[in-house]
């Protein structure tokens, strides 16, 4: 039975997380397009807080020099990634600069959505940043580690060693699944994935009288 394009929900926040390259964006896009749910994405905020002219970008430039910027003044994310994923201390420093600003973006936009019965917060580092209390339900998008590694290498054009550095910077996906309310298996095709999302949504839908 097909789900309606717009439904009424129990009022809650869903924390959508998973590992790098496991398919969080695929699920988030489906929730937005199929159910018209507001999606607040930490990765989008992470780009916003380092935009040209931002205080966070200036702090990063002060630490790493002008070579951390592209010719147009934007952050060279690839170069920064090669630094922070090779050195946990540098990654911790960067998170100390960016995480408060990202949280402020979430709080700003959540304040505009107070009347929405459900909001999806896409937070890749939900567990690592200790943000479980921000949400009422946690969904983890998962796939086997080998598949995750292959997707990451091909998506971001990384060497196997660089991919391993990025995987090591997050909780293992199996550990995240242990703490999930809902696990979405994204190891097969999108139809399989979306069927699970529909089933999960049914658990939070309030049947209309």
Curated annotation (Swiss-Prot):
Family stated for the protein in its record: Belongs to the CoaE family.
Pathway in which this enzyme or protein is active: Cofactor biosynthesis; coenzyme A biosynthesis; CoA from (R)-pantothenate: step 5/5
Source organism of the structure: Synechococcus elongatus (strain ATCC 33912 / PCC 7942 / FACHB-805)
Pfam hit, one: CoaE
Function in brief: Catalyzes the phosphorylation of the 3'-hydroxyl group of dephosphocoenzyme A to form coenzyme A.
Catalytic activity reported: 3'-dephospho-CoA + ATP = ADP + CoA + H(+)
Keywords: ATP-binding, Coenzyme A biosynthesis, Cytoplasm, Kinase, Nucleotide-binding, Transferase
GO CC, alphabetical: cytoplasm
EC code(s) of this entry: 2.7.1.24
Subcellular localization: Cytoplasm
Enzyme class: transferase
A GO MF label: dephospho-CoA kinase activity
InterPro entries xref list: Depp_CoAkinase, P-loop_NTPase
Main location: cytoplasm
UniProt xrefs under HAMAP family: Dephospho_CoA_kinase
Domain DPCK: 13-209
GO process terms (BP): coenzyme A biosynthetic process
Record-listed ATP binding positions: 21-26
Protein name (Swiss-Prot/TrEMBL): Dephospho-CoA kinase
Gene transcribed to yield this protein: coaE
